[in-house]
Amino acid sequence: MNTQLEVCIDNIESLHNAIAGGPTRIELCSSLALGGLTPSYGFMQQAAKHSTIPVYAMIRPRQGDFFYSEEEIELMRWDIEAAKQAGLNGVVLGVLTQDGNIHMPYATALCEFAQALGLGVTFHRAFDQCRDAEKALEEVISLGCERILTSGLAPSAPQGIDVLKALVEQAQGRIALMAGAGVNADNVGQIVEQTKVTEVHLSGKTTRPSHMTFIAEQSKMGAADVDDFSIPVTNTDAIANMVTALN
C-alpha cells in the first residue's frame, strides 16, 4: 500500500479493531464526537503497549476553536511530554491566531519541543480554519511538520478536492498532505487519483450495543440525544475495505 492510511480512535476496543483492518498509523484521541481531544495518559500507555503500528496522540486540550491561552499551551506541552513518556511515536496539534492564521510563536514552541523529544508532528485540521491556505501551508512546512491533515478547507475531503490538489502541487513533496473528513472506501480512489495526496485518514466508526444487562432509563450521562448504551467503535471491515481500495 503506497498510500498511508491513518485511523483515528478514542477507545481501547477501537485500537484492536482498527489494527486488525491493516492501517499504517493510529491517531489516538478522546471524544471523537467533539472532533478529537487529548487522550488520557493511561490510554497512551496502553496504545504504546498493544499497537503494532505507529501511534500519534492528539494534543487538543478542549473542544472548540484553536486559539489558545498561555495556560493551555503549557498544558499541551505537558501532554506532549506524556506522549513521549508513554512510548508513542508522535503528536497531532494545531494552533491559530484570533484572525485565522497559524500562531507561529506557539506552534514553533510546541513543534520544537516535540521534535526535541524525538516525536513526529502532524498539523491537524486547524489548518482548515485558516484564512489563507497557501500562506498557512508554507508556515506549517517551516515548522518541520511531517504532514497536514486537511479536508481542503471544505466540510469534507470530497468537497475539497480542488484545494487538496492545489496544496499538493504547492507543497512539491516538502510535506505530506493527508486527506480527511468524509473519506471512505467508495471515494478514496477518486480522491487519491485527482489530488495525488499520499496519505488518507478516517475513523471507520460504527456502534455496538452495550454489554450491560440492566439498561438504566432514569438518567443520562451527557446530552439528552446521546444513547449511553450505544458504544461508538471502529469497524474493522471499514478499515479493511479502505486498505483493499488503496491497493
Swiss-Prot record:
The keyword Cytoplasm applies. InterPro entries: CutC-like, CutC-like_dom_sf. This is PF03932 family protein CutC. Pfam families: CutC. It is found in: Cytoplasm. Gene3D superfamilies: Copper homeostasis (CutC) domain (3.20.20.380). Keywords: Cytoplasm. GO terms for molecular function: copper ion binding. It comes from the Bacteria. Belongs to the CutC family. The keyword Cytoplasm applies. The gene is cutC. It comes from Vibrio campbellii (strain ATCC BAA-1116). One of its GO terms (cellular component) is cytoplasm.
